[in-house]
Amino acid sequence: RLWGGGRKTPPEPKSTTPAALGAEGPDSQGSVERRIRPRKNARQGTKALIIDDSPTVVAALRKVLRSAGYLTREALDAEHGLTLMEQDAPDLVFLDIILPGMNGFGALRAIRKNPSTQHVPVIMISGNEHATEQFYANRIGADDFMKKPFSRFEIFARIENLLDHELVPRRKTDTAAGSAQDAPIHTSPVP
């Protein structure tokens, strides 16, 4: 009796997979839609740099990105990450805010001040969802913000937001500036 001699059969867990939900599920519209809509991936061989002091987070991001054809490099601190960027600039950076030594904000400032890396899109990562962190990350020049823990879907949704028409990650300001520079200037005669 102490170990549950009179067993009760536990209720069947409800499945939340898109196939199990079908079209009738209460939240199925969002769940099914995101999986049916084809994901827009960056080009094969896109280089991503992961800077995070958690080996678990680094391993998870590396696995997800490599499974989609990305080439990854990893650093457990900002200083090493900046060195890797100098050696071979990536197409995209995932940058944790809380790091030993230089924090993510300091690293982001260094990335934006360096002419050889200032064009690289940066997705900041943090275990905190405080609006102040997001505000400072955006103000310093982050292109997006991702809260830990994150899903595979969120990783690719953040990347997709940064892809240009050639499926290359670009800074939001770069694409806006590029399209403004390419737009024809229309002048009308002054009466």
Residue ranges and their predicted role:
Residues 100-103, 118, 130:
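The feature encodes the CheY-like receiver
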Residues 77-80, 103-109:
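Acidic catalytic/metal-coordinating carboxylates
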Residues 69-76, 84:
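Short hydrophobic/Thr-rich beta-strand motif most characteristic of the beta2 strand and flanking loop
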Residues 62, 106, 129-144, 157:
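Alpha4 helix (beta4-alpha4-beta5 surface) of REC/receiver domains from two-component response regulators
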Residues 59-67:
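Charged docking surfaces used in two-component/phosphorelay signaling
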Residues 150-160, 167:
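C-terminal output helix
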Residues 88-94, 99:
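Active-site beta3 strand of CheY-like receiver
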